[in-house]
């Protein structure tokens, strides 16, 4: 079987969605076409360990290495969405994978007093 040929994309965008249960990182080209994707669950973490900062860091290091090796990516803009624990450690993982972070943006959706929130948990 022939080896898959990847195109050269030197700059990209990392979309990080950090929920309380998991962290998902997808890397796209500047037009928004997804090149590679990884989540903490896809990196081998199961159950409550998916929502940890360590799981987010391992997933982002993996996806950063994929983007660097397969697409020759060097510089990356980061868009973070969500309140999860893996926000900062996912950015740290991209840096440790050898990618230079050129732009950081928080895209967490905030309601302007929209829907009524769910009831508070009583533990």
UniProtKB/Swiss-Prot annotation:
SUPFAM superfamilies, per database record: Translational machinery components
Organism name: Coxiella burnetii (strain Dugway 5J108-111)
Lineage: Bacteria, Pseudomonadati, Pseudomonadota, Gammaproteobacteria, Legionellales
Protein purpose: Located on the platform of the 30S subunit, it bridges several disparate RNA helices of the 16S rRNA. Forms part of the Shine-Dalgarno cleft in the 70S ribosome.
Keywords in alphabetical order: Ribonucleoprotein, Ribosomal protein, RNA-binding, rRNA-binding
Key word Oxidoreductase present: no
Subunit structure: Part of the 30S ribosomal subunit. Interacts with proteins S7 and S18. Binds to IF-3.
GO MF assignments: rRNA binding; structural constituent of ribosome
Gene3D superfamilies per the UniProt record, alphabetical: Ribosomal protein S11
Name of this chain's protein: Small ribosomal subunit protein uS11
UniProt-listed InterPro entries: Ribosomal_uS11 (IPR001971), Ribosomal_uS11_bac-type (IPR019981), Ribosomal_uS11_CS (IPR018102), Ribosomal_uS11_sf (IPR036967)
UniProt key word GTP-binding: no
GO cellular component: ribonucleoprotein complex; ribosome
